[in-house]
A protein has these predicted regions:
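Well-formed, non-transmembrane alpha-helical positions, independent of function
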Residues: 1-2, 59, 128, 253
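Short amphipathic alpha-helical segments
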Residues: 3, 22-26, 90-92, 211-212, ...
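Phosphate-coordinating loops and pocket residues in cytosolic domains that bind phosphorylated ligands
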Residues: 4, 58, 115, 186, ...
Length: 265
């Protein structure tokens, strides 16, 4: 009804790829109306060449698990170097997750998922990855006596013969170990989505190439993947949107230019 209403001049949508695709089909009959889609993401966070392990773990944790992972720009995939340093980072992250409290309400970091359906879908996603060959580091489970509260999932997808490139809207982080930085970038781009990405590193020069090579709309350095500003364009490519970034650029496609040629008689 909203898409077809004659007084509606356009529709700006935030939601999943599935919902965006359905709306796009309806709006195809109304090319005169604006359609801006901000959809999901399978967002990569690459950690490379850093000795500041505690700081890196803080950023990883915040990127993946803020709001119980229920933000479109949350990190979904963590790409680490296949080195002792990478394994140390993963071990610290595991400890950080295990230290979360689920009983003391004054010390809760995050709350439940939005609905029973979302909770079941989240756990089914985890089971799907395990079925495809992923290895569990920390397996998510429902917290007893709670309403849709689940523990975070940490899962190793390195070596999976078949990838599962879908957005998982919950507190899950998929870990991939890469042998080289080029391999890390290639894995970061190994997705149909392109919303957010991040690099954590002591080497600022790495970001110069990273930001050019990564296929995403929001690309942060030594910051959480969820950090964004309304003063900048906000949006993604691929299945993450239809090339209509929100934020600062929205003013351009929500208006139209008027061209005039003016002469004296």
């Amino acid at each position: 009804g909203l898409c077809k209403h004659p007084l509606n001049k356009g529709l700006l949508v935030t939601g999943s790829y599935k919902v965006g695709k359905q709306i796009n089909k309806i709006m195809a009959d109304y090319p005169e109306k604006i359609l801006a889609l901000e959809l999901g993401g399978n967002n990569p966070l690459v950690v490379w060449s850093t000795q500041k392990i505690n700081a890196a773990v803080d950023l990883i944790f915040e990127s993946a698990f803020i709001s119980s992972g229920q933000r479109c720009t949350c990190a979904r995939r963590l790409i680490l170097p296949n080195t002792n340093n990478g394994k140390k980072i993963l071990a610290k992250l595991k400890q950080r997750i295990q230290s979360l409290s689920y009983a003391d309400e004054s010390d809760l970091y995050y709350g439940p998922l939005i609905s029973p359906k979302a909770t079941d879908g989240f756990l089914a996603f985890q089971d799907k990855l395990i079925h495809l060959g992923a290895k569990t580091i920390l397996k998510a489970k429902k917290v007893r006596g709670s309403f849709n509260l689940v523990t975070p999932s940490l899962i190793n997808i390195t070596g999976m013969t078949k990838s599962y490139d879908e957005e998982n809207f919950g507190p899950m982080l998929q870990v991939f170990f890469a042998d080289t930085f080029d391999a890390a970038v290639a894995e970061a781009n190994n997705t149909k989505y392109g919303l957010a990405a991040g690099l954590i590193s002591d080497n600022e020069k790495l970001f110069d190439g990273f930001v050019r090579r990564i296929n995403a709309g929001v690309i942060n350095f030594n910051s959480t993947t969820t950090g964004a500003s309304g003063a900048f364009p906000f949006g993604g490519i691929g299945r993450s949107g239809n090339l209509r970034p929100a934020g600062f650029y929205a003013a351009d496609y929500c208006a139209w230019p008027k061209a005039s040629i003016i002469k004296k008689l």
